[in-house]
Curated annotation (Swiss-Prot):
Family, as annotated: Belongs to the P-Pant transferase superfamily. AcpS family.
Keyword Transmembrane helix among record annotations: no
UniProt xrefs under InterPro entries: 4-PPantetheinyl_Trfase_dom (IPR008278), 4-PPantetheinyl_Trfase_dom_sf (IPR037143), ACPS (IPR002582), Ppantetheine-prot_Trfase_dom (IPR004568)
The protein's name: Holo-[acyl-carrier-protein] synthase
CC terms in the record's Gene Ontology section: cytoplasm
Top-level division of the source organism's lineage: Bacteria
GN (gene name): acpS
Residue positions binding Mg(2+): 9, 52
GO biological process, alphabetically ordered: fatty acid biosynthetic process
Amino acid sequence: MAVVGVGVDVVDVDRFAATLSRTPGIAMRLFTPAERGLARPERLAARFAAKEAVAKVLGAPPGLEWHDAEVVLATGGRPSLRIRGTVAAAAQRLDIASWHLSLTHDGGVAIAMVVAES
């Protein structure tokens, strides 16, 4: 396997929470129903950072749908990516075979790092 791309994103949790509260419907546009179930702002901010990091790995092609990159929990609670639709198509064009995801939130910021391999 070879590294195809690395994406990192940082989100200010308070600013993100304020955006969610003042913009009706934004959570519906950004997150899957399962992701929205994690109502704590720092968890949603980390998942948004992950989606942004995925877009960076893919070169931010136009037309990516936020719901097509979903953060799920793998065995043992480790975060993992489930991709479909527009994200899966962009990943296929880059011959991406596997994804690695790390999330953290502390001190008012949420950070995601994504590594894609062929």
